[in-house]
């Protein structure tokens, strides 16, 4: 393989172990990334700024590690021993993060409150957990690169190692998303990743020991990256690179002395467009697939697969072509590949004849999603993957740096661009200029990268050729920019249902925000629907209005003194509006993660939400509801939660045992909590998990049903702080008061004419449902089991079947839940019987 630093000689037979080591290292890194983002999101929140802090810190550590550690760790050190130390350090850091995070969370909550939880404090927490391991991760490839000679074949070998590392990322994404976290939990996933690190470290030490016993190469055994005709001195003193297809010094294609900076800039632009595209296309594909944990893992795996395969192709091309010219060609072709992906995602994939509502195994739909993702994004991913080894070989042609430092520089430039691209796209571009303009910007950036890559090769004798190339790049990029389509409004609204949606509804509003795309539709009969995550989230249809009003009115009418109220999730604002019109409420805080939702609630659902946006006693906080509750110093008399569907990635954090324990700790004496649980687009196991987890924290909880003509649809879970029963007479007396006229009218609009009608939606308590809940999995912060269970049923519509199996047979009237006069209790009994 060439001369290893520290006097160690490694020959060709050791390349396969090095590939395996980098594969294991990449697999572990992706598992860690998934686990750390999941766990840290529970601490600093899942809002877009918090997610940006996590991503920026993670990738920033990689960048610093690749750039700094190869300089600090001299080339005289045995690189395999250094690699082993890095892998062991990563394993130690991974285990440390898992075990010290609870203490960090406690300190964070103690330092921050909902008003002072600044980005700086969140960044500090992320840095404490992520910087040490990611700095070590960033140095692994540059350190191993010291095992090759600085020549064309050597840089090709580094490209293969990068390809192996990326292929490991594919395995890590699939293992984490489809097995380790679905079947086990974050702890098991961490231990598995640490085991891979230790295995890679031991393998490196074994190779170092074996190789050290044969310092002189055996006769007839070729050195890796050291064919005689390909020799290039590390110091850059060689006269030429004469490998087949290699660049020839003195020709018009040979880089100038200062051209390495152009190559670094090209690598940065390539990284920027790659991560910008990944962020944007993941958002758009999630609309079409349903934003489940499975969909995100699949999209990431396809993208990484393209990068890995492309890196292998680029490593081959680095030996057979002029690397700078090939790099320029890749960037030029990326203009077309980005345009293709934009067209495929907006104009092709949404209209493939797939009916997701047909009964089918989730595996079948995942196969279709895999094909669709590859069809759209694989071409671009292949080209981005090929760009790294080509940039490395092009920079290496300049000489002047040992392989570890040079690899670290190119890696750092690529990673720095990736940081800029991901953060700029997710936090600024998509929100300010939209998805279409963002993709147009990516095409323009790729065109600039193509010109930069070729610039060092231009000589006076080739000015005409250079001018023709530049003209072709600019003209083609300009044409492609004009051809980028907008995402169709119906796709934003209906997502995976686009091919089978009914005709008639008009999309009257669309918006792209930090967390996704949103829409409002109007049916011919005037019914309005608010869409998020590619499906209806709220509407003015009777069954939806009934559920949203139940969430709010049940909570405030049952609570002793509902002065301070927290509503998690604004949506159309109907639940928040229901609590806001209660005359007893003095302060209503609405925690909403997406700022774009405010405009929708204010402009389109004002009549239904009682003008909640703009109500002087309502405070709108744009934050992850869980994070706001954890950092708030106040206690609340009412907490009501109406999150996204539990199969939406991240929503399950609002259904965990730890979350309900947090809610219980924030409830004032006599306080009430309510939460929405859907029975449709879910599985029975998922519903059992939701209800069992709630009852685990609130043993006195109760289920209130929202049915459609007697059939199950969704339910409201309710619990009180303490064991006091619900006073039916008190609820009835409140509704009879003149100041409660708006509340009574609001309830009549959805079919509740009395307190008995409202409380008669009772469907059962913990004891009643004990047999049905037996064996249900508890959803915890460590396992987030719910998002995996629910993700298997997002296209299932078994609401009534689940409701029928859930209902207790012959259950007695809940005397411990309700209290009141005999007449009032008889009214509730009759209402329950009518249901």
Predicted regions and their residues:
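Alpha-helical transmembrane segments of multi-pass membrane proteins
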Residues: 1-724, 728-734, 788-825, 830
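A structured, mid-to-C-terminal "fold-capping" secondary-structure block
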Residues: 390, 771-773
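Short, cationic low-complexity segments
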Residues: 733-758
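Intrinsically disordered, low-complexity terminal/linker regions enriched in Pro/Ser/Gly
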Residues: 762-767
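Periplasmic c-type cytochrome electron-transfer domains
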Residues: 775-776, 781-786
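Amphipathic alpha-helical repeat scaffolds of TPR domains
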Residues: 833-835
């Amino acid at each position: 393989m060439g001369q290893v630093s520290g006097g160690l000689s490694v020959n060709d037979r050791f390349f396969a172990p090095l590939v395996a080591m980098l594969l294991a290292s990449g697999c572990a890194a992706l598992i860690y990334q998934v686990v750390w983002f999941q766990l840290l999101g529970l601490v600093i929140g899942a809002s877009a700024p918090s997610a940006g802090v996590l991503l920026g810190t993670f990738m920033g550590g990689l960048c610093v590690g690749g750039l700094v550690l190869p300089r600090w760790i001299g080339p005289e050190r045995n690189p395999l021993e250094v690699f082993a130390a890095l892998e062991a350090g990563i394993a130690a850091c991974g285990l440390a993060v898992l075990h010290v995070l609870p203490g960090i969370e406690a300190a964070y909550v103690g330092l921050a409150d909902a008003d002072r939880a600044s980005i700086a404090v969140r960044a500090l927490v992320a840095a404490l957990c992520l910087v040490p391991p990611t700095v070590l991760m960033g140095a692994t490839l540059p350190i191993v690169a010291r095992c090759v000679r600085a020549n064309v074949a050597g840089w090709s070998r580094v490209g293969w190692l990068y390809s192996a590392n990326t292929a490991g990322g594919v395995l890590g994404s699939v293992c984490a998303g489809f097995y380790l976290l679905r079947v086990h939990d974050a702890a098991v996933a961490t231990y598995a990743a640490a085991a891979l690190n230790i295995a890679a470290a031991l393998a490196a030490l074994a190779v170092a020991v074996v190789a050290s016993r044969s310092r002189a190469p055996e006769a007839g055994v070729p050195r890796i990256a050291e064919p005689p005709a390909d020799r290039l001195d590390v110091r850059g003193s060689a006269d030429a690179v004469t490998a087949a297809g290699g660049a020839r010094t003195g020709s018009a294609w040979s880089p100038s002395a200062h051209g390495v900076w152009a190559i670094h800039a090209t690598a940065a632009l390539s990284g920027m467009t790659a991560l910008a595209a990944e962020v944007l296309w993941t958002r758009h594909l999630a609309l079409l697939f349903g934003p489940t944990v499975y969909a995100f893992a699949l999209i990431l795996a396809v993208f990484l697969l393209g990068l890995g395969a492309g890196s292998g192709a680029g490593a081959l091309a680095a030996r057979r072509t002029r690397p700078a010219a090939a790099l320029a060609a890749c960037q030029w072709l990326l203009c077309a590949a980005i345009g293709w992906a934009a067209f495929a995602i907006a104009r092709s994939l949404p209209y493939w004849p797939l009916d997701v509502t047909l009964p089918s195994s989730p595996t079948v739909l995942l196969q279709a999603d895999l094909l669709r993702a590859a069809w759209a994004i694989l071409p671009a991913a292949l080209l981005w993957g090929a760009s790294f080894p080509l940039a490395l070989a092009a920079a290496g042609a300049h000489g002047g740096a040992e392989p570890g430092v040079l690899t670290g520089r190119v890696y750092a430039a690529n990673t720095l661009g990736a940081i800029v691209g991901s953060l700029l796209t997710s936090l600024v571009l998509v929100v300010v200029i939209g998805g279409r303009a963002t993709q147009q910007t990516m095409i323009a950036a790729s065109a600039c990268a193509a010109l930069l890559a070729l610039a060092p090769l231009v000589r006076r004798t080739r000015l005409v050729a250079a001018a023709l190339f530049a003209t072709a790049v600019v003209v083609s990029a300009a044409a492609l920019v004009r051809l980028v389509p907008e995402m169709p409004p119906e796709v934003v609204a209906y997502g995976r249902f686009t091919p089978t949606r009914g005709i008639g509804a008009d999309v009257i509003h669309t918006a792209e925000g930090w967390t996704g795309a949103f829409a409002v539709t109007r049916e011919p009969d005037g019914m309005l629907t608010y869409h998020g995550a590619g499906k209806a989230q709220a509407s003015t249809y009777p069954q939806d209005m009934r559920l949203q009003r139940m969430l709010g009115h049940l909570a405030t009418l049952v609570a002793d003194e509902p002065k301070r109220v927290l509503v998690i999730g604004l949506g159309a604002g109907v639940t928040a509006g229901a609590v806001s019109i209660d005359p007893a409420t003095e302060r209503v805080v609405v925690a909403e993660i997406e700022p774009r939702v405010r405009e929708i609630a204010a402009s389109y659902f004002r009549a239904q939400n009682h003008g909640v946006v703009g109500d002087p006693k309502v405070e709108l906080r744009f934050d992850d509801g869980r994070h706001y509750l954890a950092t708030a110093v106040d206690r609340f008399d009412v907490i009501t939660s109406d999150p996204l569907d539990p199969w939406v990635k991240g929503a399950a954090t609002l259904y965990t045992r730890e979350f309900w324990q947090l809610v219980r700790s924030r409830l004032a004496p006599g306080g009430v909590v309510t939460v929405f649980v859907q029975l449709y687009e879910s599985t029975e196991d998922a519903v059992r998990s939701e209800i069992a987890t709630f009852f685990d924290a609130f043993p006195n909880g109760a289920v209130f049903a929202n049915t459609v003509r007697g059939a199950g649809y969704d339910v409201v879970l309710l619990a009180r702080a303490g064991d006091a029963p619900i006073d039916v007479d008190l609820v009835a007396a409140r509704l009879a008061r003149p100041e409660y006229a708006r509340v009574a009218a609001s309830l009549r609009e959805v079919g509740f004419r009395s307190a008995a009608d409202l409380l008669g939606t009772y469907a059962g308590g913990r004891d009643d449902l004990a047999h049905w809940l037996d064996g249900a999995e508890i959803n915890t912060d460590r396992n987030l089991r719910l998002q995996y269970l629910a993700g298997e049923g997002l296209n299932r519509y078994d609401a009534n079947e689940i409701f029928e199996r859930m209902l207790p047979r012959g259950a007695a009237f809940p005397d411990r839940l309700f209290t009141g006069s005999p007449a009032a209790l008889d009214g509730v009994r009759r209402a329950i019987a009518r249901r």
